[in-house]
Amino acid sequence: MRRLNRKNSDASKKLNDRQRKVLYCIVREYIENKKPVSSQRVLEVSNIEFSSATIRNDMKKLEYLGYIYQPHTSAGRIPTDKGLRFYYEEMLKISKETSEADLAVETFKSMPLADPEKVLFLAGNLLARLTEGYVLIERPNTRDLKILRVMLIPVSEDYLIFSILTEFGVSRVTPIKTQERLNWEEIERQLNFLLRGKTIGEVLLGRIESLKGSGFLRLIESLIGETIERYLDAGLENLLKDETLALEDIRNLLEEIKDQKFLESLVGEGISVMIGREIGRKNLEKFAVFSGRYFKGESPIGSVYFFTSKVTRYDRNHKIFEYILNRLSEYFTSTSRR
C-alpha cells in the first residue's frame, strides 16, 4: 500500500486541469534538467495554450498550496516534496491507462535456476543500473528454509564432509574429524529420513526427538550460526554521481540504514514510496525510497529497497521496481516447488 498523505490528495482536488498540467510540466522539467522552471519554459515544452501571465498566476496558486517554491526573487520554481508526490501519483494513473512499458530487462529472464544468491545479485545490480539508485535486498532467512538432503562424504580415514542442502539451492558445508569407523551411509540415510522436509528452524528448536543431545544437532547449529550478511547491496556509486546529493547526505543514509527497525518501518503492503519528509528522518529529506517484498507463494521471504534522489524518474522507476519484485517472487515460488 502506498504511503499517501491525505492532505496532499485533497489539496490536489483544488486544482483545475490547466493547473495540474502546469504542475506536472514543472516537476517533469525539473527532474530532467535540475534547474528552476519559469512560466516561459512551461509554455515552450508543453501544449498549454494560455498566456505567460495566466501560467504565472497558476504558479502562484501552486506555490500557495505548497506544490512548488521559488528559491529567490525572479527565479523559476522548484517542486516541493508535495509536488513530487503529485507527480508520482499522476504517473501511476497514466501507467494504468497505457500498456506496460517494454523495459530493458530481458537479461533477467535467463536468470540461473539453481543459485538464489546469483539471482539476488543479478536483481540488485539490474535494479541499481536501471533506476540509478542504491539498492538493498534482504536475503531469505536461513531458518525458514526446508532441508532437501543431508550428505556425509568421507574424504579420508579421519575426515568426512557434512553438508546440508536446502530449498533454493542454499547449502552449508563443514568438515568433521572422525575418531571411529561407522557406517556413514546408514547414518546419512537415517538423517535424511529424520530431516528431509523439515525447516532448519524446526530442527534447531529441538522438534526432532532423535537428534536431541546429538553431535549432529550441534553441527547444524554451528553451520547455521555462521555469519551471513542479511542484505546485499548495489549501486552506491549512483548516489555518489548524483549532483543533487552531497557526500554528507550519502553518509547520513548509510548510517540510517544500519537501523533494522527503520528499514522495516519503510515497508507496507505492495510497493511503498516515501518522498523527502515522508521518510520521517530530517537528514534524509533529499531522498526518495521505494520498498516492497518478494514472496515464496503467499509468504513474504525478503524485502527490497532502493534509495535515490527525490528528483527522479518516478514513472519509470516504479515500473522497473514492480517488475523486479514480481520476477523474484516467481523465481522463489517456482524453485520451492521443484
Curated annotation (Swiss-Prot):
GO biological process, one term: negative regulation of DNA-templated transcription
Disulfide bridge positions per record: none
Keyword Repressor included in the entry's annotation: yes
Highest taxon, organism lineage: Bacteria
Keywords: Repressor, Stress response, Transcription, Transcription regulation
SUPFAM superfamilies: GAF domain-like, Winged helix' DNA-binding domain
Recorded coiled-coil stretches: none
GO molecular function: DNA binding
Gene3D superfamilies linked: 3.30.450.40, Heat-inducible transcription repressor hrca homolog, domain 3 (3.30.390.60), Winged helix-like DNA-binding domain superfamily/Winged helix DNA-binding domain (1.10.10.10)
Function, in words: Negative regulator of class I heat shock genes (grpE-dnaK-dnaJ and groELS operons). Prevents heat-shock induction of these operons.
Homology family: Belongs to the HrcA family.
Protein name: Heat-inducible transcription repressor HrcA
